[in-house]
Amino acid sequence: MKFFIIVLIVVIAAGACTKGGKPSGVNGIVYAVTSSATSKQLVPAIDTTATAAFSGLYDETTNILTYTITWSDLWLDTKKDTITSIVFYGPATAGANGAVVRTLSFVSTNKAGSANLGLAGNTGLSDPEKTDFMSGAWYFTINTKRYTTGIVRGQLMLSQK
């Protein structure tokens, strides 16, 4: 009996595993979401060496966006600052400003680093937000105490996986 239970557990566990490869949602509609952010993309632009990168996945079926934001050189050592939030805006094309869609409170005193974040559940995208987001009309900023409207900006681009 003990052997039978162990075999049953192994069979169930093996059946739950995937082969790896491309991630997929319930029906396979998953998008890669990427962006390269700089201070030059802000409107109006500011002159800094700050950069950031956005790398994520959006599952259209579950309406979940998971992502990692990596940033560097947000400030000089002599002018320390603090990240206060990550803000999503839309609809707007590159070179234009949009309305605030989501503000995620996030605090870091590191001028370089990364964070794994997400939008899901109650904070998932509404239908109009989803339309704008999927058409590339969203951008994000990293806001700090000194740069309350953003020190870097990056337009979010989607491509189906």
Model-derived segments and spans:
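Sec-dependent bacterial lipoprotein signal peptides
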Residues: 1-17
